[in-house]
UniProtKB/Swiss-Prot annotation:
The modification N6-(retinylidene)lysine is found at K293. Pfam families: 7tm_1, Rhodopsin_N. One of its GO terms (molecular function) is 11-cis retinal binding. Belongs to the G-protein coupled receptor 1 family. Opsin subfamily. A motif ('Ionic lock' involved in activated form stabilization) lies at residues 131-133. This is Rhodopsin. The record marks E110 as: Plays an important role in the conformation switch to the active conformation. One of its GO terms (cellular component) is photoreceptor disc membrane. It is a multi-pass membrane protein. Its main location: membrane. Glycans are attached at N12, N197. It comes from Neoniphon aurolineatus (Yellowstriped squirrelfish). Residues 1-33, 94-107, 171-199, 272-283 are extracellular. One of its GO terms (biological process) is G protein-coupled opsin signaling pathway.
Length: 347
């Protein structure tokens, strides 16, 4: 059922349209589902905020972490905080009431910040892949990655993210409640007159999903080839072989993490866009959005907590300057400095 500034994902046989800005949406799903959504958002907040905030704090406290290659990881933490503060809090609050209580303006604000955080995160992963490919594979001879390049990479993620999130605020597409009507996102659902949703969705999927997906697969594919070549040239070196296995494992985890985060949401959104008028329930879009929102937790785990240097500094900060696991860390760490492959491993 389509309203002037919303879309209810169900067939309305009664002819009554209940605005998600004014009325509880308990007729869509069992009220227990709204309670679960609120509890899930609360879980993401109490885990996602401390982990990402701690990442920023630890970096400010430890000078050795403030290196150009780590700038993009900090940007990733900032983007996750945008999602937590700008998106999860409002979704939790709305789910407690059963509808989007913040009104049309609140929907624009929540949709903008939640989408901005997601886009910055997505492009940060693409820039991270480019940086590692450039540093390890050296496609440009005599190129030395420095602070200016890192700042440029971070700036690009913000510019690209804004190029996706600002247009719906100024009339090219729009933000509307989606799923269980407690969170707002891009309008994939309608072809509302005057918003040019079709062209925007095609632009978004082409430039802001397909392009970063290609970048990640290309860069990490080339990186794996470089690591395997380095390992093949030093077959007698157990250290190099171990480094290859570590890098391969991390690349696989990174790609899987990206796909788990974005592929379900993007696939369902594209299906809804290309099958407008088809019947689907509110959970059809709500469940994939859970995967995308969960990135605020597993992004820090994959890209930061599994980074030896970040992990050791984080433990030192938490234990007031001491690392009780220092012996274990040193014993389990591999001396991969001798291999060029080691510079890519975030672990």
């Amino acid at each position: 059922t389509e309203g002037p500034d919303f879309y209810i994902p169900m067939v309305n046989t009664s002819g009554l349209v209940r605005s998600p800005y004014e009325y509880p949406q308990y007729y869509l799903v069992n009220p227990a589902a709204f309670a679960f959504l609120g509890a899930y958002m609360f879980f993401l907040i109490i885990i996602g905020f401390p982990v990402n905030f701690l990442t920023l704090y630890v970096t400010l406290e430890h000078k050795k972490l403030r290196t150009p290659l780590n700038y993009i990881l900090l940007n990733l933490a900032v983007s996750d905080l945008f999602m937590v503060i700008g998106g999860f809090t409002t979704t939790m609050y709305s789910s407690m009431h059963g509808y989007f209580v913040l009104g049309r303006l609140g929907c624009n604000i929540e949709g903008f910040f939640a989408t901005l955080g997601g886009m910055i995160s997505l492009w940060s992963l693409a820039v991270l892949a480019i940086e590692r490919w450039v540093v390890v594979c050296k496609p440009i001879s005599n190129f030395r990655f420095g602070e200016n390049h890192a700042i440029m990479g971070v700036s690009m993620t913000w510019l690209l993210a804004l190029s996706c999130t600002v247009p719906p605020l100024v009339g090219w597409s729009r933000y509307i409640p989606e799923g269980m009507q407690c969170a707002c996102g891009i309008d994939y659902y309608t072809r509302a007159e005057g918003y040019n949703n079709e062209s925007f969705v095609i632009y978004m999927f082409t430039c802001h999903f397909s392009v970063p997906l290609f970048i990640i697969f290309f860069c990490y594919g080339r990186l794996l080839c470089a690591v395997k070549e380095a390992a093949a040239a030093q077959q007698e070196s157990e250290t190099t072989q171990r480094a290859e296995r570590e890098v391969t494992r991390m690349v696989v985890i990174m790609v899987i993490g990206f796909l788990v985060c974005w592929l379900p949401y993007a696939s369902v959104a594209w299906f809804i866009f290309t099958h407008q008028g088809s019947e689907f329930g509110p959970l059809f879009m709500a469940i994939p959005s859970f995967f995308a929102k969960s990135s605020s937790i597993y992004n820090p785990v994959i890209y930061i907590c599994m980074n030896k240097q970040f992990r050791q500094c984080m433990i030192t900060t938490l234990f007031c300057g001491k690392n009780p696991f220092e012996g274990e860390e040193e014993g389990s760490s591999t001396k991969t400095e001798a291999s060029s492959a080691s510079s890519v491993s975030p672990a």
